[in-house]
């Protein structure tokens, strides 16, 4: 289990500070920038058999919150979308979506009663990267059809 957790953190957490360190100098020079991390809502709601994954995703979101505050004086906004139940052919291929058991799960666990459309997710991400969202600093936005609140 420890080796698995280390692998998950190496894949999901360790690259994030390197990405920020690479992108931030030019943003500081410009006094402007946006970094939007696409994370997982599993960090916001416990799930069975996903402790290492959820912990790594939680570390990502904690990093976003901290570095967001650190970079805000430079007019750089760092935020995250914590998603689950978003249309994605990798996680939810057509055969999964058509399965009655999956439809029952959506009805039971997701107040929206359906997957969040990829278009909805993309439009929200575009908004967060626009000037209209300059006021958000180190925020984590669940995009999951209400799954986190249940």
Model regions and ranges:
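Catalytic loop of short-chain dehydrogenase/reductase
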Residues: 1, 34-59, 64-73, 85-86
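Catalytic Tyr-X3-Lys loop
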Residues: 1-20, 32, 36, 60, ...
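Structural signature of the Rossmann-like NAD(P)-dependent dehydrogenase/reductase core
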Residues: 12, 34-40, 77-82, 111, ...
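A short, exposed helix-loop element centered on a Lys and neighboring polar residues
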Residues: 20-21, 65
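Alpha-helical segment proximal to the catalytic Tyr-Lys
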Residues: 25, 69-73, 134
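Short C-terminal tail/terminal secondary-structure segment
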Residues: 45, 126, 137-150
């Amino acid at each position: 289990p420890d080796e698995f957790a280390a692998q998950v953190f190496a894949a999901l957490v360790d690259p994030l500070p390197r990405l920020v360190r690479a992108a931030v100098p030019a943003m500081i020079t410009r006094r402007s920038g946006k970094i939007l991390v696409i994370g997982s809502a599993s960090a916001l709601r416990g799930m069975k058999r996903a402790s290492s994954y959820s912990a790594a995703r939680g570390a990502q979101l904690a990093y976003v919150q901290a570095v967001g505050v650190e970079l805000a004086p430079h007019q750089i906004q760092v935020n995250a979308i914590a998603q689950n139940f978003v249309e994605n052919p990798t996680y939810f291929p057509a055969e999964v979506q058509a399965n009655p058991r999956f439809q029952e799960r959506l009805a039971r666990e997701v107040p929206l009663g359906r997957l969040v459309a990829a278009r909805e997710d993309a439009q929200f991400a575009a908004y967060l990267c626009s000037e209209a969202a300059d006021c958000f600093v180190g925020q984590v936005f669940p995009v999951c059809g209400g799954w986190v609140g249940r």
